[in-house]
Amino acid sequence: MKEKIVIALGGNAIQTTEATAEAQQTAIRCAMQNLKPLFDSPARIVISHGNGPQIGSLLIQQAKSNSDTTPAMPLDTCGAMSQGMIGYWLETEINRILTEMNSDRTVGTIVTRVEVDKDDPRFDNPTKPIGPFYTKEEVEELQKEQPDSVFKEDAGRGYRKVVASPLPQSILEHQLIRTLADGKNIVIACGGGGIPVIKKENTYEGVEAVIDKDFASEKLATLIEADTLMILTNVENVFINFNEPNQQQIDDIDVATLKKYAAQGKFVEGSMLPKIEAAIRFVESGENKKVIITNLEQAYEALIGNKGTHIHM
């Protein structure tokens, strides 16, 4: 059976100084060119992606247009909107590449829900800032309308709403994603970490939270029984003691050593550490699992073993 890969795109894949749709589509076009050799390979491919800047813009738009006739949409709905928007952009550019290659592969996006535990202790300590900045006076008014919401000062720039970042428990659409990926389809899923939902009797209900995209990508890779999780970020390799005089590049490492480095605080919290934690979970999820961490430009070279950081048992 051909290798199955989950590619977790970092925010730099859609990074641009302009927030227009055209500018973001151009950034994605350039990003996808780096993945062209993978699309031309026999590998079965699922792509996940971030949505930070995009959902931030959506939330600001919702706040500014909020009225009785155009009420602001909640965070889970905005997450779904961003998945559709970015998925559409990715589909367009990947389809362009597949057509140029005369490939018979197809590409599609699955709006993805991710189940979280309503009793996750992270709900008691919201830390993820979202949406626009507010003044102290604006926050006082908002608290009257949203008594359960939490606002925190953000580096002297004003106040922002903060939400929880619970751990993913399951991917509701994972069987569909697996079926599509096992065919000739390139599947885009788990955008922005997925839409967080909790079980309510015989259905699921969206909650106001943001799931770490690396943790969601790991959970997806585990559930669809992928062979490789490739996490694409803005550096070619993982380093211990990054940006310090004694920084050291890691090319190949086993999980036991990686755990030791993580326990010693060798990785930056909120930056490389979540990627390391996701990597450890995936490698330990089954036999012969591997994780590659590198940048977008070196994705194919890393896949064939020439670049990047390779993590294994």
UniProtKB/Swiss-Prot annotation:
InterPro entries: AceGlu_kinase-like_sf (IPR036393), Asp/Glu/Uridylate_kinase (IPR001048), Carb_kinase (IPR003964). It comes from the Bacteria. One of its GO terms (biological process) is arginine deiminase pathway. It is found in: Cytoplasm. Its EC number is 2.7.2.2. It is an enzyme of class 2 (transferase). GO terms for cellular component: cytosol. Keywords: Arginine metabolism, ATP-binding, Cytoplasm, Kinase, Nucleotide-binding, Transferase. Belongs to the carbamate kinase family. This is Carbamate kinase 2. The lineage of its organism: Bacteria, Bacillati, Bacillota, Bacilli, Bacillales.
